[in-house]
Regions:
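Conserved catalytic core of nucleotide-sugar-dependent glycosyltransferases
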Residues: 91, 110-191
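Active-site-proximal specificity loops/subdomain of glycosyltransferases
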Residues: 44-100
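Short beta-strand-to-loop acidic/aromatic patch adjacent to the donor-nucleotide binding site
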Residues: 98-109
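Short internal beta-strands
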Residues: 40-44, 131
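Short loop->beta transition adjacent to catalytic acidic/histidine clusters or analogous donor-positioning motifs
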Residues: 6-9, 30-41, 71-74, 99-100
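Short, acidic, metal-binding catalytic loop of nucleotide-sugar glycosyltransferases
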Residues: 25-37, 45-51
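C-terminal catalytic/acceptor-binding lobe
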Residues: 1-6, 21, 25, 183-262
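Active-site beta-to-alpha loop of glycosyltransferases that engages the nucleotide-sugar donor
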Residues: 12-23
Length: 262
């Protein structure tokens, strides 16, 4: 049962070689028990990181094309290729003053039919960022964050599920509202910072900026997917080992230099 009505948007990005799995991901979203008002898909012509780009803005997978043409709620937007940051920032900027919900998803997951319904309901219960995949980092202070030192989501107590420092990961879907970033004004869009400190780790950037805004994160234990279609994504290529830890520490250091408080 949906608690409230309102504009709910799904936002995602993808790369050229993922067209087949993207089609399966989108299919799982258009079949949700709670349909979003719109699905925004951000693609790019220019190559960047793992993406060779969509030359001449052409989608070459016929099944993906048919799905898009058959579902008017899917909107393709061609943008500069900033890698994973396309997933949230373009839509966040467009909807900055709107009282809406933005749910980001990955392009390589067949999602549970109730994902959006559950995320929206949990938002109205907790009024914060919501995700169904993540962890509680174990540290005495944020500067000592270690991506590998954590309490996994399935082991969290009810009290631990809601915390300022919980770390959501994109595959589980992440629910945001533009107002969650308003306290620090346009900080979240400062590409001269995030492209230098965490260019491949968008989760790190949104995590640190959210903390600066003093917005909690609720990590629910509801099912979020039916099948993982991922293979060789950013984490496998760039963010395994201690890359995420290094990126977060660099980001915190830079923001502290700019007098942001944690």
């Amino acid at each position: 049962m949906i608690i409230r009505d309102g504009q709910v948007y799904v936002s995602l990005t993808s790369i050229f070689k993922n067209q087949d799995i993207l089609q399966q991901t989108l299919q799982s979203i258009v079949k949700q028990t709670k349909q979003p008002n719109k699905i925004f898909l951000y693609l790019s012509e220019d190559p960047y990181i793992l993406d060779e780009g969509f030359k001449d803005k052409k989608i070459t997978n016929p099944n993906l094309l048919k799905l898009i043409n058959d579902n008017a709620i899917i909107h393709i937007n061609w943008v500069k290729n900033t890698g994973p940051y396309r997933k949230l920032l373009p839509l966040l900027k467009e909807k900055w003053e709107e009282d809406c919900i933005i749910i980001t998803i990955d392009d390589d997951t067949i999602y549970d039919d109730y994902l959006i319904e559950n995320l929206v309901n949990d938002y109205y219960k907790h009024k914060c960022v919501v995700s169904y995949r993540g962890f509680a980092p174990l540290f005495d202070e944020l500067e000592n964050f270690d991506y590998g030192q954590r309490c996994e989501q399935e082991n969290l107590s009810c009290e631990q599920q809601l915390s300022l420092y919980n770390f959501p990961t994109g595959v589980g879907g992440i629910l945001y509202k533009p107002e969650f970033f308003h306290k620090t004004e346009k900080l979240v869009f400062e590409n001269e910072i995030y492209l230098n400190t965490c260019d491949k780790q968008d989760d790190i950037w949104f995590y640190t900026v959210r903390i600066c805004n003093n917005v909690n994160c609720y990590l629910g234990k509801k099912p979020f997917h039916k099948k993982d279609l991922s293979f060789g994504g950013l984490y496998a290529h760039f963010n395994s080992g201690n890359a995420n830890t290094v990126a977060l520490k660099k980001t915190i250091q830079k923001l502290k230099e700019l007098n942001y408080q944690f």
